[in-house]
Amino acid sequence: MSVLWTIGYEKLRPESLLAELQAAGVERVLDVRLRPQSRKPGMSKTRLGGTLALGGIAYEHRRELGTPPELRELYRSASSEKHARAAAGFREHLEAHERAAVDALAAELADGTAPKTALLCLEEDHEVCHRSVVAEALTERVPGLEVVHL
């Protein structure tokens, strides 16, 4: 059985994020933010990639798995109804526009040679983050894929 981890760095410092990923045995982080910049120190693409590399974890930005701007506002809302609409809209977006990217990642995970992988985004709560939709799309394509939310 393959495992896919997800993690949100919202309340973590770079060293805490690294420690949590290492404790889980993660070998590769796929940053699924559309834009890999952050106001949080150390969490933008270059610095984050450097920190992870020092800890033996590979970093890749997968822009195509990021949330389109028109859905981002729905995710930011405190409304569970808007979160559900955002998730449904993002699911449709993935299937209509990024199916090849999801299929390619699924193939990587299914063949058993991919490094132990975590999807990374900002949001602490996976239930209100698009990374859960990406993970769900992957479980539909990879038999036996288990998702662990850190």
Pin down the residues of each PLM region:
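Residues lining hydrophobic/aromatic ligand-binding pockets adjacent to catalytic sites
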Residues: 1-150
